[in-house]
Amino acid sequence: MRRSIRAIAAALTVALILPAVVLSAWPVADRHSYISQAFKTGHRADDIAAPGGTEVVPIKAGRVVFAGWKRNCGGYQVWVAHGNGLYSAYYHLRSESVSKGQNVKRSQTRLGRVGHSGCAKGTHVHLEVWRGFPWGSKSYRVDPWKYINSGTWLPYRYR
């Protein structure tokens, strides 16, 4: 009896952890892109440098909850809800290619293109991952690296 309870507990733990880690992907469609500034105190995101105009894709499937311009220094941005209180936000885009309410597929749907809108210095995507709706009173940002599965190549320099 004890073994079966432990087996069930282990299976539930795996079921809760794996979707967040395994089902995500590198958000910039360029093999020469890299993390130019990592998640740390004072910078609660990963900045991914890439040539202007490079496609930006979601790290995970979900539904767009915001797409457009905001005056928060993020410029053109897209926010995606992935379920279970997980959101990803992509800032400094050249423009957005999706609209609010649209379903997006991991690595397949173009959210926009890399740009330097808002207060950006140089072309990059500022990627944030949130637990809770972005900028909500009980929400907080988590390290995006924990949700990116970059495959067999590692497009980063400062990790």
What would you call each of these model-derived segments?
Residues 124-128:
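Histidine-centered divalent-metal-coordination microenvironment in nucleic-acid enzymes
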Residues 97-98, 110, 116-123:
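Short glycine/proline-centered loop/turn elements that form peptide/ligand docking sites
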